Amino acid sequence: MEVANCASLPHTVLVPRDTSAPAASAPAVTPMAFARAIVVAYERHAKSPATALQLAQIAPTQLRDPNARMTAAQMETLAAAAMQELDDEGLAAYGRKLPWGSYGMLARASLSAPDLGLALKRWCRHHALLTDDVRLTLSASGPQATVSVQEQADLGDLRELTLAFLLRNVHGLACWYIDSRIPLLEAGLPFPAPPHADAYAHMFPGSLRFGTRMATLQFDAAYLALPLRRGEKDLRLMLQRALPIPVRPYRRDRLLVQQVRQALGNHPQECHNAEGVANLLHVSTRTLHRQLKDEGASLQGLKDEVRLERARDLLYRSTKPMKQVAAAVGFQSEKSFNRAFRQWTGTTPAKFRSGDG
């Protein structure tokens, strides 16, 4: 299934899209209203959209049909052509142009953040340098994180496209930063449900509300603590992509790995086996193993990582006898601890402590 893309462009915008089916055979679910909004952008720049529409294979009759739909690939082609031709990634929605490369600059500015929370805060703050017509904020209340878009100017005929684009862009960027799918708890849109409201279920899977006070995205706040998994090389490669980053690389939800690590580190006595870990996380052991496998991890592998980190810390920072270190790390005997430590590191605990390892 292909997802309706509200504003897709190469080099700068990250819009999750399932590419399991080729564009030619994918269903057309993206509303033609988005294409009509891009035509309005051309009109505001006093330019013709003919070339962009031709590249996207959108006929004038389709453009005039209020019920017409297009594929995500058509929308990507149209938006990319328009943003480059107009040199405006804001598509004329704001009081000033957003030159080609603006959103790539924002992505780079947040790349050095230690975790997703700080990266998104920077991204929202830096967005105000591009335009003050909208204000983006990230907030967290209890277990829920919210990205909000406050309109500070009349976006006119481009309002729906602009708000949908902003939400999709920040969600796609967040997924890309941590290399993980981020399920949405709810998306809020501050306008009545349009005739093509069904398309929004593809754009924002999860609970969806129209007529909210402002545009919002809500997701589990635990994702904010996840570290960024991208570097400058990744960014350069991403900026060379001709299509938005698809959702497939993010089908593995890395949040569970983080939760398992925390459980193993904070509750070692309760996490001797899979049943104990599963009980702490309120999932079945079958679900635990299956989801960890989907994320490319295993419970034993995570236990070894946590044990090794704990062992290194105790060996380096304390003078506890080796038997006590072994017990603190979760081994019943010093011998089994020595054997495991050698397998992990290639050296013995004693040599590691002395600095000879």
Task: Name every feature range the model reports, one short phrase each.
Residues 1-147:
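N-terminal low-complexity or simple alpha-helical regulatory segments
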